[in-house]
Amino acid sequence: MAHKKAGGSTRNGRDSESKRLGVKRFGGESVLAGNIIVRQRGTKFHAGVNVGIGRDHTLFALTDGKVKFQVKGPNNRKFISIEA
């Protein structure tokens, strides 16, 4: 006879790998062309001057320079630019 009741399987116990999103280069930091500035889902930050936007909304530097964060427009959107 069994002395323990049979353990049922659980439906939990899974978790997705973290995606390492967020700001990679902060305001005032020097960047080289091609450096990733922000990894994001959607456009939390928008591309400003000398900043490109990737297929997954990643923002990256198009030229060498310093990162500049600014809030612009009627909707207070956050823009990231590169000042040469």
Swiss-Prot record:
GO terms for molecular function: structural constituent of ribosome. Residues 1-22 are annotated as: Disordered. InterPro entries: Ribosomal_bL27, Ribosomal_bL27_CS. Pfam families: Ribosomal_L27 (PF01016). Keywords: Ribonucleoprotein, Ribosomal protein. One of its GO terms (cellular component) is cytosolic large ribosomal subunit. Gene3D superfamilies: 2.40.50.100. One of its GO terms (biological process) is translation. PROSITE patterns: RIBOSOMAL_L27 (PS00831). Signal peptide: none annotated. Belongs to the bacterial ribosomal protein bL27 family. This is Large ribosomal subunit protein bL27. It comes from Shewanella frigidimarina (strain NCIMB 400). The gene is rpmA.
